[in-house]
């Protein structure tokens, strides 16, 4: 890692890589996605991202975002044609069971992303937010019912919800 930073730190704004994610249903290798995904999602993992000091000085975190300040900063750098370097290397082992990565923060993340995309005041976005909120409540209720009724069925449902960029390793 030291050699990488010695060779690259003055030539790029952001170095990012992959990570291992521990979820309630297993351990996964998470490969960063193509940066074009910034249009709809967060294609890289902030724990596996190194940002040049000059970027922090020129962009600063927008602290009005409780959860998505890192997303906004990196998205802004990307759309300002910042230089990103992807390294196919696991920089982080990450626990996604608790904290901000848990599904309980999903609504706040969606709300903040709406602000970042500049869509949060539109009727369409408010409708999407309402549908998403109801969807999360229904999923939570169904998970509780499945856990109570059938452990094997619950495990199958959890496995179906694994994003494409995750590869199960245990």
Task: Cite the ranges covered by each PLM segment.
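Conserved donor NDP-sugar-binding/catalytic core segment of glycosyltransferases
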Residues: 1-28
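Extended hydrophobic/Leu-rich segments
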Residues: 8, 64, 166-170
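Alpha-helical structural elements of signaling/regulatory helical domains
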Residues: 10, 82, 105, 122-123
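A short coil-to-beta-strand element that immediately follows conserved catalytic motifs
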Residues: 13-15, 87-89, 126-128
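Conserved nucleotide-sugar donor-binding catalytic segment
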Residues: 17, 23-112, 116
